[in-house]
Amino acid sequence: MTGMRRLVTILCITLSAAATGAQDGGRKAIAYVQAPEMSSGLCVEKDTASAIDCAVKQCIEGGGTIEDCQVNATCSPGGFSVDILMMADGGPHWHQFSCGWQARELALKAAELACSNAKDNGLIECTAVQLIDEDGTVVEPPFN
């Protein structure tokens, strides 16, 4: 399970990094920082560094430590993003974050794909819990 999660995370970060060169002036970056089982931070800012700094501050303010608040994902431009809650049998949970999508429907499809083999990976829950647009507006389910 952990290997697949890391592979998907690396793939998402790699694909989002490839889009960096296509950044349009004025578009914002997004960063998601997570301290597993403690806290997280999500920020949309003018550039990636500012978004990361802001998200780390939020994570720490929420109870995470500087050591545990790790960057989960960044995208510039941010596009549409989705926060996916994953919970393993036995209770541990974490969030997978996918960003940089050109349309909200694509972000939701990314969540669907991430959860497509959830039971095979020992997950008892896998669901999109937030959809974020490029301006940082957060929408919670249902996403209709």
Put a short name on every predicted segment.
Residues 1-8:
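Bacterial N-terminal signal peptides that target proteins for export
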Residues 16-19:
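N-terminal signal peptide c-region/cleavage motif recognized by signal peptidases
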Residues 21-144:
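Secreted/extracellular ectodomain signature
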